[in-house]
Amino acid sequence: MRKLTPMMQQYMEIKNQYKDALMFFRLGDFYELFFDDAETASRELEITLTARDCGLESKAPMCGVPYHAANGYIDKLVSKGYKVAICEQVEDPSVAKGIVKRDVVRVITPGTLIDTNLLEDKKNNYLVSLYMSSLGCGFSYVDISTGELLSTEIVGTSIEQNLIDEISKIEPNELIYFVEEEDKIGTNFIEGIRKKLNIHISKYDPWTFEESYAMNQIKNQFNILTVESLGFSLNHLGINATGALIHYLKSTQKRTLSHINKINIYTFTEKMVLDISTRRNLELTETIRGKNKKGSLLWILDKTQTAMGGRMIRKWIEEPLLNIQNINRRLEAVATLKNDILLRCELKESLKQIYDLERLSGKIAFGSATPRDLVALKKSVAFLPDIKKLFENENSGLLKELLNNIDTLEDIQALIESSILDEPSISLKDGGIIKEGYNDELDELYVAAREGKHWIAKLEQAEKDRTGIKSLKVGYNKIFGYYIEITKSNLHLAPENYIRKQTLANCERYITPELKELEDKILGAEEKSIAIEYEQFIEIRNMLLHEIERIQRTARAVAELDVLYSFAEAASENNYVKPTVNSSETIDIKEGRHPVVEKVLENNMFISNDTYINTEDEQLLMITGPNMAGKSTYMRQVALIILMAQIGSFVPATSATIGITDRIFTRVGANDDLSQGQSTFMVEMSEMATIVNLATKKSLLIVDEIGRGTSTFDGLSIAWSTAEYICQSLGSRTLFSTHYHELTKLSETYRGIKNYKVLVKEDKEDVIFLHKVVKGNADRSYGIQVAKLAGLPAAIITRASHILSDLERESIQKEQYIIESTAENTLTASTDVANEKQLKLDDFIESEIVKDLKKINLLETTPMDALNILYQLQKKVAEI
């Protein structure tokens, strides 16, 4: 029976350890892939699939790429979601006995990329570790390119919702997980995430999530005795997730992770909570249509000059603060920068010269930093003293704190300046890295190399004089070394001591003993100098390993300063004002504007509006008006102004007082989720269920046209009861827009509900939208006028007008009945219920509705399912 060849046996032994990865197997100057890996790679990379004799009866499928061009191919595979294991020759083939030893030196995955050419400068590349048990969830994530590591645990209610919010917020490229077998909810959740999000998800070894093992991984990484010293509490589920994450990184990267030297353990009470719907509807970092940065809040506020600042401003926008003191510290810093245009300009000029210090430190830690990376580091730190000098008179506050955290790193600059050429070679293997004067032995070799060129020129001239051949020249190539070249027409003049080396079409090439002696001296010096340069560079890079924490601390301070500069620049450019943020429950905005819409409108055409909301007599603003009048823009504008204030930004208004807001909820638009089997109405109800279950008195609710996804009477009923529930049970500050003009009657019953409308000017049969929100209620929807503006044919418009008149006459009595009936049966009308005849349960025991209720398992029913069940029961009741 035929067996695999020794080399293929070696391949299979290594491949079996990395079954989930495509293995790039180093053979000389190529990386080769075999069997299934080869078929996958040839298809994905569009390269030729061949075959190789492997010792078996049939040949092994094979494809390969040159090692010097492998990065491009690897990057393409990783971007498609594949893992790639790099298997290198780990001993010199010239001294190997038998098969050259090989081993995997790194596994590259979507979440462990460090190649800056593949990473977005202003966006993190996160890898998530998820541990789900019956007790809750441990959630940790890392950006290996910067060393940032965070962890939390999610317990209690709304675990799945909080997880979805966190995952969608950080947008990881890879997720590893373990779900305890008995935790069915967790398994279903993972499958849902796999379907919805475009990330690489893989189940990881369960034993790496075990608490004792995970704890040891954390202790070893941070060189500590107890995990409590990092901030973990006993039995914190984040321990399981973090330990497994560290194990995964070490097992794939095959090296120490010295740049991961701190961990941020956070809770959900530190920042404003923004769920996935709110972030999408407010278009915080990208637009709903097109998924573009342009048109988002980030587009307006991002004036950052550094890559680190660009990543940080994205985080700030998605994580507004709840601590009033910290908010005001940011606002004071922004005010200082906004009020001093000269300071701001000088700061900008310094910031724009600074490279990505976070990712440079990551490359140093990984041992992948090139000579040019070190030059970029040197150039960056050269501007740090200038930044510190700008704020030398700053005595307190956030700016002073940041400047204290900026280390000028002058010793690092001096080291690189004295050792690395200003324009070094790209490759470590070609020399051209180390400056003269840094190493004595290298200096001697440099002299020999320079003298060697002079020796060659001198020999060439001597041979021309001796032979009389004016066209004679001395050349060099890597195969033959140095040679003397004589054209065919002068061959008869070649001396006898010339030794023929190569014959070409038009010339002959020779060597001489003297030339060979010179070659040995010159090439020996060059080869030795290249080897020493490489050793010296590695030594310098290793010296910088000990300074990574200093570089990272400085990078974080520079990034934060960059974001504050960005806020100040945006405030100055767009005429924003400093908001007042306090602990009250009042929102008072004068002449507020939508930060994005005003930017895209020409000639300052945006109409500003006031907003006043509290939790007492102006708690729910019932807003009516036609489509296109600006209701949605107005409501989003209020939400964005609150959010901007709580990230420490100035706001688009003439004044703004913001009572701290713990969550912003939005029920905006009709976003069908048909791929998940959810209709417009179901999505609407699910989002509303989330709001009523999680909102507090400190929350802001944006409710836009609830109930329009179903029939008129169903929709009106749901909108009516929802408004009542918000007003009575939640007490949340709410902007509630509707086309159901009947809802304006609620202001007569509830003190906290106030009616507002968007002004419209009628011009004969046309309508002009004034976009001004004032007290009162609209009496018409102007739907036909809007249809006319949209360009519907005149015949349709005329016919619609006739139908509308008929319908209005028929429904006026029915609508009056609904209004009177509903007003008499509000949630507060409990006295009516008490006076009704007491009914017995036996009267209904055999009804279909009671049978349906018996079937419901409350322990396994999610809020969304419950709302859907309630909706179905309501329909059955309506049919009785």
UniProtKB/Swiss-Prot annotation:
<dbReference type="GO" id="GO:0006298">
    <property type="term" value="P:mismatch repair"/>
</dbReference>
<keyword id="KW-0547">Nucleotide-binding</keyword>
<keyword id="KW-0227">DNA damage</keyword>
<comment type="similarity">
    <text>Belongs to the DNA mismatch repair MutS family.</text>
</comment>
<dbReference type="InterPro" id="IPR017261">
    <property type="entry name" value="DNA_mismatch_repair_MutS/MSH"/>
</dbReference>
<dbReference type="GO" id="GO:0030983">
    <property type="term" value="F:mismatched DNA binding"/>
</dbReference>
<dbReference type="InterPro" id="IPR005748">
    <property type="entry name" value="DNA_mismatch_repair_MutS"/>
</dbReference>
<dbReference type="InterPro" id="IPR027417">
    <property type="entry name" value="P-loop_NTPase"/>
</dbReference>
<dbReference type="InterPro" id="IPR007696">
    <property type="entry name" value="DNA_mismatch_repair_MutS_core"/>
</dbReference>
<dbReference type="Pfam" id="PF00488">
    <property type="entry name" value="MutS_V"/>
</dbReference>
<dbReference type="Pfam" id="PF05190">
    <property type="entry name" value="MutS_IV"/>
</dbReference>
<dbReference type="InterPro" id="IPR045076">
    <property type="entry name" value="MutS"/>
</dbReference>
<dbReference type="InterPro" id="IPR036678">
    <property type="entry name" value="MutS_con_dom_sf"/>
</dbReference>
<keyword id="KW-0234">DNA repair</keyword>
<dbReference type="InterPro" id="IPR007861">
    <property type="entry name" value="DNA_mismatch_repair_MutS_clamp"/>
</dbReference>
<dbReference type="GO" id="GO:0140664">
    <property type="term" value="F:ATP-dependent DNA damage sensor activity"/>
</dbReference>
<dbReference type="Pfam" id="PF05192">
    <property type="entry name" value="MutS_III"/>
</dbReference>
<keyword id="KW-0067">ATP-binding</keyword>
<dbReference type="InterPro" id="IPR007860">
    <property type="entry name" value="DNA_mmatch_repair_MutS_con_dom"/>
</dbReference>
<comment type="function">
    <text>This protein is involved in the repair of mismatches in DNA. It is possible that it carries out the mismatch recognition step. This protein has a weak ATPase activity.</text>
</comment>
<dbReference type="Pfam" id="PF01624">
    <property type="entry name" value="MutS_I"/>
</dbReference>
<dbReference type="InterPro" id="IPR036187">
    <property type="entry name" value="DNA_mismatch_repair_MutS_sf"/>
</dbReference>
<dbReference type="InterPro" id="IPR016151">
    <property type="entry name" value="DNA_mismatch_repair_MutS_N"/>
</dbReference>
<dbReference type="InterPro" id="IPR000432">
    <property type="entry name" value="DNA_mismatch_repair_MutS_C"/>
</dbReference>
<dbReference type="GO" id="GO:0005524">
    <property type="term" value="F:ATP binding"/>
</dbReference>
<dbReference type="GO" id="GO:0005829">
    <property type="term" value="C:cytosol"/>
</dbReference>
<dbReference type="Pfam" id="PF05188">
    <property type="entry name" value="MutS_II"/>
</dbReference>
<feature type="binding site">
    <location>
        <begin position="625"/>
        <end position="632"/>
    </location>
    <ligand>
        <name>ATP</name>
    </ligand>
</feature>
<keyword id="KW-0238">DNA-binding</keyword>
<protein>
    <recommendedName>
        <fullName>DNA mismatch repair protein MutS</fullName>
    </recommendedName>
</protein>
<dbReference type="GO" id="GO:0003684">
    <property type="term" value="F:damaged DNA binding"/>
</dbReference>
<dbReference type="InterPro" id="IPR007695">
    <property type="entry name" value="DNA_mismatch_repair_MutS-lik_N"/>
</dbReference>
